[in-house]
């Protein structure tokens, strides 16, 4: 008699397992995430030192493997030997990201375009008018899921930015390494 009751319960549980696993899959089509990164930006121009990099973003998944990321980034590398002189970068951009399913670890690559607003500063004051330049970014990294809705990510990116006209350094390109936290909803 006990077997008669156990068998339907076991069959129902087995039937629901694939649905439960699919419901937990992240990312999924039409899901979104917000996140923040902190890291270091190393300009390719010798006249600039490395600087702190901060980024915030919103990411929308068109499929489980493809997403569109809109972001705002800030870095402020100092001039080499320049005392309190630095070159502030603000990036407003969009990136196309492709990721691969790897269980709790998802490697990803991407590319994007953005407007980089650059302004030379000294002791927090502007030294010249800012310049807005078009730039691109190539990126890659890994995302490590700590739960179904939270992940930690490590990312490397190279920023290719149009040359600056009115103040130095002329070439503002650079390499950035970041660690971040991402929350899905």
Language-model-derived ranges and their functions:
Residues 42-52, 80-86, 165-172:
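Solvent-exposed loop/turn segments connecting transmembrane beta-strands
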Residues 24, 52-125, 131-139, 144-150, ...:
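Gram-negative (and chloroplast) outer-membrane scaffold detector with strong preference
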Residues 1-29, 185:
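Cleavable N-terminal export/targeting peptides
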Residues 38-41, 78, 121-125, 162-164:
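Extracytoplasmic loops and strand-loop junctions of Gram-negative outer membrane beta-barrel proteins
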Residues 26-42, 107:
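Transmembrane beta-strand segments of Gram-negative outer membrane beta-barrel proteins
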Residues 153-155, 159-185:
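Hydrophobic secondary-structure block in the mid-to-C-terminal portion of proteins
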Residues 40-44, 96-100, 162:
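Short, well-ordered turn and helix-capping elements at secondary-structure junctions
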């Amino acid at each position: 008699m006990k077997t008669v009751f156990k068998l339907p319960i076991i069959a129902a549980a087995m039937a629901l397992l694939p649905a439960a696993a699919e419901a937990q899959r992240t990312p999924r089509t039409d899901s979104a995430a917000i996140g923040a990164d902190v890291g270091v930006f190393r300009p390719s121009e010798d006249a600039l030192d490395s600087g702190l990099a901060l980024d915030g973003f919103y990411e929308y998944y068109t499929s489980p493997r493809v997403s569109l990321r809109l972001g705002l980034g800030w870095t402020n590398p100092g001039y080499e030997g320049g005392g309190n002189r630095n070159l502030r970068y603000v990036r407003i951009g969009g990136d196309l990201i492709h990721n691969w399913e790897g269980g709790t670890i998802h490697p990803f690559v991407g590319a994007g375009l953005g407007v980089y607003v650059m302004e030379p500063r000294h002791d927090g004051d502007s030294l010249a008018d800012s310049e807005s330049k078009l730039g691109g970014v190539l990126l890659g990294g890994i995302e490590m899921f700590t739960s179904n809705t939270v992940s930690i990510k490590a990312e490397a990116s190279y920023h290719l930015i149009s040359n600056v006209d009115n103040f130095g350094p002329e070439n503002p390109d650079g390499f950035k390494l970041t660690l971040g936290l991402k929350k899905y909803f």
